[in-house]
Structure formats: C-alpha cells, structure tokens
Amino acid sequence: MTQTPETALKRTPLHAAHLRAGARMVPFGGWDMPVQYSGLKAEHQAVRESAGVFDVSHMGEFRIQGEGALAFLQHVTPNDVSKLRPGRAQYNWLPNDRGGLVDDIYIYMVGENEYLMVVNASNIDKDWAHLQTLAAGFGVTLTNESDRWALLAVQGPKAAEVLQPHVDVDLGSKKKNAYFPARLFGFNVHLARTGYTGEDGFEVFIDASEAETVWDKLMAIGVTPAGLGARDTLRLEAGFPLYGHEFADDIHPLSSHYTWVVKDKPFYGREALQQPAQQKLIGLKLDKVPVREGYPVLQSGQVVGHVTSGTSSPTLGHPIALALVQAGAADATDFEVEVRGKAHPATRTDVPFYKAP
C-alpha cells in the first residue's frame, strides 16, 4: 500500500544510517523503525553479553518548568516526584480517571523547578493533550521538545566500558537512574543510566542534528546496532511491561507487578486505581511452541485470560509470555495456551524471567 501524505511514516534523524546498515524497516507507532540488522538473536546476545545501541528517537520529550512544576507532576502521577533531586530520574505513570493508564513514563529532574518527561512514541499527542488539560492553574510551562532530541540507548554489561574513553565524566561514579550532562565524542549530550533491556546501560539525549555522527562513531568502536525485535525480546525477558500490551487505557495497572509505583498521596485518577484489579499479570513458560499477543490462556479447559506478550527467549532457550488472567486464577501453577485451536501446557513462573548477573 502506498503511503499517502496523511499516513506517511515519520522518520528519526538516524533513518539514513539504518538504511546504510542494511536494517529491515517496519512501521511502529507511526514511525519507520529498524526491526533488525544482522539478526534478532545476534543483536539480543550482543546486549546480554557486551553492548548494543538502539535508536529510540521516536520517543517523546516534554519539558515542564515553573514554580508549580513539582506540584503539577505530583498531581498527574502516582509515584512521589518530591523524592527526586537534580540529576536523578524516576519511572512513573500517567493515570486516567477510569482505572487505566494514559501512558507509562520516565521523569528526569533537570534542576530546580525543571523536569524532562519521556513518553512512548505512539502516545505523544495523547499525552500532550492530557497534560495540557490538567496544567491549568499550576503555574507551569510545558514545552514539547520531541522534535529537538534524538535518543540513543547504549545497553549491555560493557556499555560503560565502551563509552568511558569517549566521555568527559567518570561513568563508574554514576548510579542507576542518574541523569547528567556530558561530552560524548566531543558533542554536548545528557546521559541517563536507564534502559529497557534488563542490563546496565546509558540513554543518550543529543541534538537531532548531531545524532547521526555520534551513531556512526558508536559503530566505529564496535557497538552492535540493535533493532526493535531485540528490544522486545530483551524487555520481555526482564519482565518490563510495554504500553499497548501490559498497560493500556483500559487495563488496571495494579494487575501488574509494578504496584510499588503507587505511593500514598493524592493524584489524578487515584480513586479509580483504588478499585481492586480484576486481573493479574503473570509470567508463563512453555516447552516448545512460541505464543503471541491475544492467544487464550486456559485453566482446566476454561478460558481465564490472554497472552499480552510472548516470544521464544534467546537467553533461556524456551518460549516465555506475560498474560493477564482472572485474579482468582492467578495463583495456580498449571495453565494452557491455545495456539491455532490446540492447547499447549504452560507453567506460571516468576517475573522477571531473566536477571542480569
């Protein structure tokens, strides 16, 4: 199908670099994104054992400034943003008033009365409208900087080792969720010790016009380019939810294992989140047959839920899945997943499926 101007896919600042590297491109959240380069398993293994880099420039960035910035963020999120200090980051949610999520997000404290919020690519417009609606009266200025920044995620146990010779900051002194300015290959960037793979790593915020040069330099020092395919298998092994799968406008987020996000404070949507979750998110492992989103989950022959994400785990060597099941069925051990009309045994297992050594 030919893309019309109205449906044309957006491109990140690294689009040409992906094509040069032979990436297979696919539509994702309205963007033309690399799903793989050399191959999913090789890219996955590189991140688990060494270092890989992802283009996540499709993510959105909003700057929140003003004397009311903290009060505003406390109002729109359930985690306690007052715990942040300049140079620190925090995982958080944007709840709606119906017991679901507008999005799951990261908040970075830049300085006094100034924060950066990173949101999922497919939710940029929705999140922006939601925040604009709730901002009235808080004395804050919201700026959508999504087109200003490119975002690269250098992930893996050797991420710090490969970056250290090329930055002017001691990376060893930076703890998880640190956020700090640096010079990388001579370019001004902000680095965050955050990621979505279950490994150590750094996310690089850089001016969109300079991103391709930095990407090429990362290629030159041997960092493996990795696509959305490996990003998904890595995050699933680590038990990380993906918006649109484990979280959504109509999925109670406290069905997940992320109950720690909600703190005892007032926030928009709190009353709806206080209603008990009717489902629970569980981990499943299977012997041979990979399962996909939407496949029915059965217990004693009865449908009790569905798969939200599934893959064949490159690290573990067998299929794994996250599934939403009825709360009353969640404590059982033995389930089945229906694949093309046939039920395959599945065993509930702890999440995360994989933890970095």
From Swiss-Prot:
Keyword Transferase: yes
SUPFAM superfamilies membership: Aminomethyltransferase beta-barrel domain, Folate-binding domain
GO biological process per UniProt: glycine decarboxylation via glycine cleavage system
Pfam families referenced in this protein's UniProt entry, alphabetically: GCV_T, GCV_T_C
E.C. code: 2.1.2.10
Domain of life: Bacteria
InterPro entries named among the record's database cross-references: GCS_T (IPR006223), GCS_T_bac (IPR022903), GCST_C (IPR013977), GCV_T_N (IPR006222), GcvT/YgfZ/DmdA (IPR028896), GcvT/YgfZ_C (IPR029043), TrmE/GcvT_dom1 (IPR027266)
MF-aspect GO terms: aminomethyltransferase activity; transaminase activity
Swiss-Prot/TrEMBL keywords: Aminotransferase, Transferase
Reactions catalysed: N(6)-[(R)-S(8)-aminomethyldihydrolipoyl]-L-lysyl-[protein] + (6S)-5,6,7,8-tetrahydrofolate = N(6)-[(R)-dihydrolipoyl]-L-lysyl-[protein] + (6R)-5,10-methylene-5,6,7,8-tetrahydrofolate + NH4(+)
Transmembrane parts of this sequence: none
Coiled coil start-end: none
Cellular component, GO annotation: cytosol; glycine cleavage complex
EC primary class: transferase
Quaternary structure annotation from Swiss-Prot or TrEMBL: The glycine cleavage system is composed of four proteins: P, T, L and H.
Family label: Belongs to the GcvT family.
Cited HAMAP family: GcvT
Role, per record: The glycine cleavage system catalyzes the degradation of glycine.
Protein name in UniProt: Aminomethyltransferase
